[in-house]
């Protein structure tokens, strides 16, 4: 009787072992030292395989051990809770989209390609940039790719970054650029928490500066207010400018394109993506219409063309940049991307529209400043005095661990600990006035003993 071709069994295993010239599966691990091999059964709570129903009961038992917060977390740090409309969830669960497979065959992928083209178009309009790729992993990876783009263009090794940039992004960049010998040099902040341009001017006299990075707003939520001046300095020195920007903040501030920024990066998490222990996210990367910049872009780019019959069609373009075509000569080794998340962002942006983004940004600004005002009533002041959006850092002048643990006892998650006494709070449209008031009263109780 023939064996089923897709089910593993002893005969197949024997044939595979014979074909590679070993006698047993143990021989495959001969290079692993004996002292670190596991030579006993796994110490599990159950001694036999479980049925599907028993597994579900076990998982529910574990799930019930989780504590549930009574309100969205106030945890800052670059990823914040936002409301995800039901239509976004519905559309990305459709079988036509629910895959990360790259649409190499345009003749059977017009729907997916058009959806990604719409995403690129919407981001281009929001950022006022001209070329957008079809997504990267997250903000950190997009920034690393932008820095390596700059390095490939001008061959220089130093990148000036704000001291108050997102530290998690900085760690990603250090990891990605280590092999290239790229050096990050921090620009100190002023008392407002923005880039100290007087210090910057003395730092960019070096001939080896490849790029200047500006984060808008920065890790502390503070708006940079001298971007035009920084860009002007960079252009005079022929230094590439990179801006990382919060998409929702663009409902209040000038987009990167108005500053003539060379490369823009960001994260689409706030454009219709839920928080799931930090992922999946959506790396955004956009450039000016410049041949050098576009040719050095990483990732997929969807273009609009016409077929042999003159009909409109969508297809992947400039594919000779990519690793499946060029291998080690590619602009990046990034492959399966965040296409599903890009479609979610496209649906979200289409749903809100230009006016919706402005109204949402205004609401976030008002609520976050209300929270800051209420904290000031308790004698808790911000670390920097610059204007901010969504996130702000405060100094409690006492051990924040004590405050945070007491908040958790009330099922309230406070801000991100920055130091012994400081924390970064995030307030968005999902935090109502009553939630903010309850947070303040809970902190007041901690202060009163």
Curated annotation (Swiss-Prot):
Q: What HAMAP family would the database entry show? A: GcvPA
What is the protein name given in its UniProt record?
A: Probable glycine dehydrogenase (decarboxylating) subunit 1
Provide the E.C. number(s) assigned to this enzyme: 1.4.4.2
Q: Which EC class does it fall in?
A: oxidoreductase
On assembly, the entry states:
The glycine cleavage system is composed of four proteins: P, T, L and H. In this organism, the P 'protein' is a heterodimer of two subunits.
**Which SUPFAM superfamilies does the record cross-reference, listed alphabetically?**
PLP-dependent transferases
Q: Which organism is it from?
A: Sulfurisphaera tokodaii (strain DSM 16993 / JCM 10545 / NBRC 100140 / 7)
Identify its protein family.
Belongs to the GcvP family. N-terminal subunit subfamily.
> Gene3D superfamilies annotated for this entry?
Aspartate Aminotransferase, domain 1, Type I PLP-dependent aspartate aminotransferase-like (Major domain)
Any one Gene Ontology MF annotation carried by this entry is: glycine dehydrogenase (decarboxylating) activity
Q: Which InterPro entries match?
A: GcvPA, GDC-P_N, GDC_P, PyrdxlP-dep_Trfase, PyrdxlP-dep_Trfase_major, PyrdxlP-dep_Trfase_small
